[in-house]
C-alpha cells in the first residue's frame, strides 16, 4: 500500500476507535519513522501528521538535520535511551517518551538546557522481563522523578504484551490508565494527562482503553 493511502487508513482507524472509546479523548498520531527517509517523513507531515517518533539516536541525527520541516514537526524519542546519549537526545528531540529509570530521569534533569523537558514515564504493565520500565507501583524511585525541576512529566507510556490475546493487551492498557489515576491521587493534582498506549498492531485497543497517543509505523 502506498504511504499516503496507509496514513489515511490509520487516521480512519483512529477516528473509528475514538467513537468506540468511552473516554472522549483527543488522540495524537505519532508516526514511528524508523527506516523512513526524509521524503517519506515530509509526506507524512503534508498529510497532517505533526509528530514523529524515532528510537535510534544515530539514525535520527542524520535524518533530522536534512528534514525541511524540522522546526514544524514535534520530534519524540520513543526508544530505550542510554544515559551517555542523553545530551545528544536533548539536542535532537522535543520530548523523551521513554524515561524508564530514576537514573535516566536524573541525567535528563541535570543535562537539560531548557526550562522544562517534556517526558513520559515508561511503565512495564505486562511484567515481561525483556521490557524496560518502572513497575506499576508507587515506589520511592518513581515518585522521586516528579520532584526533578527540569522535567515536565505529562503522562505515562507502556508497550502492550507480545500476544494475540486481546484480553491480555486490554488488561495491560487498563492497568496503565488506573495507575495514572493512582499517581495523580498520590501527588494531589491532575499532573498526568497523557497515556501513550498502542503501536501498529494494537493502537485501536489502546484508544478504546483511553490512550491519548499512539505510535504507529507508517
Predicted regions mapped to residue ranges:
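Conserved alpha/beta-domain cores
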Residues: 1-201, 207-209
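Gly/Pro- and small hydrophobic-enriched strand-loop and loop-to-helix capping segments
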Residues: 211-218
